[in-house]
Amino acid sequence: MNIAITGLGIICAIGNDCQQVLDSLVNKKTGVGMMKYLQSCHKELPVGEVKLSDDELKTLLGLPVGSLYSRTTLLGAVAVKQAMADAGLSADMLVGKKVVLISGTTVGGMDVTERILVEMRDTLQTPNTQQQSPVDYVKRHDCGSTTNEIAQICGLDCEVCTISTACSSAINSIIVGCEMLRSGEADIVIAGGSEALSKFHLNGFNTLHILDTEVCRPFDATRVGLNLGEGAGFVVLQKEDVNAKAYIGGYGNKCDAFHQTASSDDGEGAYLAMREALESSGIDKSQIDYINAHGTGTPNNDPSESVALKRIFGNDIPLVSSTKGFTGHTTSASGSIETVICVLAMQNKFVPVCYGFSHIDEACIHPFEGDDKQHRMDYVICNSFGFGGNDSSLLLMKHDRSLPPPSPVEREPECDNKSPFKGDLEGLGEFIVADITIDSMEQLADYKEYISPKEGRRMGKLMKAATLTSLMALREAGIECPDAIITATANGMLETSEKFLVDMVDNGEETLSPTLFMQSTHNTIGSAIAIRTKCHGYNITYTQGKDSMKWALRDAERLIRMGKAKTVLVGCHDESSPLFQSFYDYLNLSVPQIYSRSVVLKAK
């Protein structure tokens, strides 16, 4: 079954809608420049900002200017509304249908939290009168809340899901959306991602010394780093092909299982993701017309991706470019923003140039530099590779294509009009072969059988607990390396993130720790377990508040019942942290200090 893309929505540094973005690409106009809205001291760093203030975005959405929303929410709502309108859908038309909104983000509400953190802390010194106070924003800080708010602003009364796999989040949202359509869990999926620039974000990447002080130059011999960007991209996915803009023919989600921030020299994760996208589509590699590369412009990513491309295509590599010289690296939103860009290129038969490229690097592929020709754009691959080696690829097709019958291991379950996957452990009893929980600090004391003292000293309590329950569950199940790793977390590495945030707010932006930032992404746990177990299989992280585990279990059951995995490690991991615990206490919210549960599912 090929999934139809029936609506497109985009807002980024080169335009506030599809037409503006198309014009900028055709006219080779970059959106990367001096920061205007982000209030950072690092003015030397160019960024790909959306050319609208928060107040202008609120006005565009019909929201009160005085209302408090994260920029992630606002950008996402703009793109979702565009995609719905492009598909000819209104909220009223969706009543009675199984609709799902899936968004990818990592920043979530951080742009607001960092701005009002001092005010939030000061409020702790005053009595809680049960009226709205700055502390209340802690309930909206998380990634899942931004997706809830996007749905609310767009009038969507539907299932809501958030995925956070760093820079591959948005493509993974699209992949999950396709799987839900194939399984009968949804009639219509609106999938993509949204990410706002924040000081936390900017300074984190800056501590890694991978930001360029000029416009980035992917695959260029003189490249030194990336430019951060922001924006949102969403697509409407349907099984019907009415007014289809393009089709999704295949996709791959694999893990490099190499390092938390660096890509392997042989590009294993990228290679496996592209190979799976090709195999699942039935398209021969010789038919690919264009590849939108992840191409960040960093010294590490570009040669690694180039090796992966050469492993797939040999000496016959299709036209390749990275569009991050136009938009900046929009991190969690990059996959969906670039998916929309790919569809625009397919519709208009042009290949976006690799902006900024001028010097050949023998260690990299030679990207497309531009011409005046129209190009066949029938089959296109879009790559997104994230921290932790969460690598995903999407294969887009201009026309519908009848595929050969699926093999027995790829058969789809027979479904009625109800969701076949409930996301609860009770319904999965037949598959559960191990179930381990840690919910107290005392249980972390005896970890040395699984974690060395040296490792333990470097780990925070959540990483220690997650590693312990995961390895104990795998041992109990008699499995060294699972086929897939699925993680659920409401707040991710909260203690690590809090330390970085507080240090930045209290001591400025100049002396921050790269180690803290490297361990702040929500997919840190899932990727660390993959690295430890050498698992190159499917790897994803759900972050939808209290429903995170439900989404993770639904995905795991789907993989098993559809024959895509025989063994799946599912983990639910969350923690509290000193300052955030003070906020929770102030609001009389009950949050455990530590909670880690790992379950192994095995097909019969």
Question: Where are the predicted features?
Answer:
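Short glycine/serine-rich loop segments
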Residues: 178-197
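Short conserved active-site loop signatures built around small residues
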Residues: 170
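Conserved "HGTGT" condensation-loop signature of ketosynthase/thiolase-family condensing enzymes
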Residues: 1-158, 179, 198, 206-227, ...
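A short, small-residue-rich loop immediately preceding and capping a beta-strand
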Residues: 159-165, 187-193, 568-573
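A short local structural element in Rossmann-fold oxidoreductases
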Residues: 202
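Active-site histidine-anchored catalytic micro-motif
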Residues: 173
